[in-house]
Amino acid sequence: YEERLKALGGDDDELANGVYQEIKKQLVAQGVPPHEIAFAHDFNTDASRKVRNEKVNSGDIRILIGSTSKMGAGLNVQTRLAACHHVDCPWRPRDIEQRNGRIERQGNLHKDAGKNIRVFQYVTEGSFDALMWHQ
């Protein structure tokens, strides 16, 4: 992911200031309160990440947006997650497993109650990402 992002001339901060803000704007337009949406990159210390994780697990933060590098290994926020949305296709299969692992794990109240949890992949028809998801 990081290599691909650098090849495109971007970094997590650029994503945060562009794509992530647009996603938040659209969510707010659909009625999601802004304080229930957070960006993983805004939590830069162990203490702030702990607070973030507690807020996601309690439901105070309903939507957490971030990259694989910011939300990968060690992120335990599965308690109330109902869906995982992929807006790109990572180059490494283990990154897909890591992303889906945020939601598909023991301790998820939805999964443990037998409710469906969902994983979505968004792609542009005919794009390279579409090809990657089909491999």
Please describe what each predicted stretch is.
Residues 40, 66-67, 86-88, 121-123:
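Conserved beta-strand segments of the P-loop GTPase G domain that flank and frequently precede/overlap
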Residues 1-6, 44-46, 70-72, 90-92, ...:
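Short, solvent-exposed loop/turn segments at secondary-structure junctions
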Residues 91-100, 104-135:
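A conserved SF2-helicase RecA2
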Residues 76-89, 118-121:
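A short beta-strand element within the Helicase C-terminal
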Residues 33-35, 73, 113-115:
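Residue-level signal for beta-strand positions within conserved beta-sheet cores that form or flank
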Residues 24, 28, 33-68:
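Conserved helicase ATPase core of P-loop NTP-dependent helicases/translocases
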Residues 1-41:
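Conserved helicase motor "Helicase C" RecA-like lobe of SF1/SF2 P-loop NTPases
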Residues 22-26, 51-55, 76, 80, ...:
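Alpha-helical scaffold elements adjacent to nucleotide-binding pockets in ATP/GTP-utilizing enzyme cores
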